[in-house]
A protein has these predicted regions:
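Short, Lys/Arg-enriched N-terminal segments with co-localized hydrophobic residues
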Residues: 1-7
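Short, glycine- and small/hydrophobic-rich beta-strand elements in well-ordered beta-sheets
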Residues: 72-94, 121-136, 194-219, 233, ...
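Short, solvent-exposed amphipathic alpha-helical segments in soluble enzyme
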Residues: 3, 187, 236-238
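Short, solvent-exposed secondary-structure capping/transition elements
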Residues: 107-111, 117, 121-128
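Short amphipathic alpha-helices in soluble, non-transmembrane regions
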Residues: 110-118, 232-239
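Short, charge-rich binding segments
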Residues: 89-90, 107, 120-122, 159-161
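Short S/T/G/P-rich N-terminal loop/turn motif that feeds into the first structured element of a domain
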Residues: 9-77, 103-111, 130-199, 211, ...
Length: 268
């Protein structure tokens, strides 16, 4: 092999190999409302923590690592939807979140492999990962329903925008008793849940399903304009009739929406 060609092969970033493997994957088109859409998408919420050793590197090494990290995000964004968020100073165990949205689990696998084989990847821990699938809710059958003498829209159109400055997320699991209740009884309680949520129109909810895939049954994520309004919404939901049937709903993460460039400037 020619020496120049050999040098080019040797200097090709290993992460680029995984990006090339991801090239056949179609970039997902998000439905207007995931709670009603029949299209199944893969959601993977990956939380990362930068190791202390990163800060012992020379400035030049860190700058090169930051450029490579951005290259990975922008390259894979052709095949996945990648939403970055900062948790810096908001959660002691994490520094940032990458919300990956893919049509196939292989997209998540290849992105993770690329990041692990990058320079920055040597200095990242991933303390939390939540894998879910989207699917239509079994409790949404009609566009409207009467509840307590009031016309209630079961779930308003909640378009994915990614523009809200605040993002909240937690996994949760229902009790065994919940699944033994008659369907109509469960549905009535969920309609009350929806009615309370609808009183906070700037708080958008995305519930996805991890049953059979991960340790929890669901992951619920919220986009919000104001953390005070989100907190008020959660406090009201604590009073709902379905609340006693929640077995666990921690850990909870508070995240701030950031562009890739903003995230890199903050955490690296």
């Amino acid at each position: 092999m020619d020496g120049g060609v050999a040098a080019m092969v040797e200097t090709k970033p290993k992460w680029l190999t995984y990006a090339e493997m991801a090239s056949p994957l179609p970039r997902p088109q998000l439905p207007r409302n995931i709670h009603k859409s029949t299209e199944r998408l893969v959601f993977c919420y990956q939380f990362y923590k930068v190791r202390p050793e990163w800060w012992q590197l020379a400035d030049e090494e860190r700058e090169e690592g930051k450029r490579e990290f951005l290259d990975i995000l922008h390259t894979f964004d052709r095949h996945l939807l990648i939403r970055p968020y900062s948790t810096l100073g908001l959660k002691s165990t994490t520094d940032f979140l990458l919300w990956l949205i893919s049509k196939e689990m292989r997209g998540v696998e290849l992105f993770t492999a690329a990041l692990q084989h990058s320079f920055v990847g040597r200095y990242l821990d991933r303390p939390y990962t939540y894998l879910t699938l989207t699917r239509p809710s079994i409790y949404l059958r009609h566009s409207q329903r009467r509840l307590e003498g009031e016309a209630v829209e079961e779930h308003p159109e909640q378009e994915f925008t990614g523009d809200a400055p605040y993002f909240f997320l937690y996994p949760f699991t229902k009790t065994h008793e919940w699944y033994q209740l008659p369907y109509e009884q469960r549905r009535e309680m969920m309609l009350e849940h929806f009615r309370i949520g609808n009183q906070f129109p700037t708080v958008k909810t995305y519930t996805s399903y991890s049953i059979g895939l991960d340790d929890y049954e669901f992951v619920v994520a919220f986009e919000a304009e104001d953390p005070n309004e989100f907190q008020e919404c959660v406090m009201r939901l604590r009073e709902a009739k379905a609340r006693p049937y929640t077995l666990v709903d921690t850990p909870l993460f508070t995240c701030l929406k950031r562009t890739p460039e903003e995230l890199v400037a903050l955490v690296f």
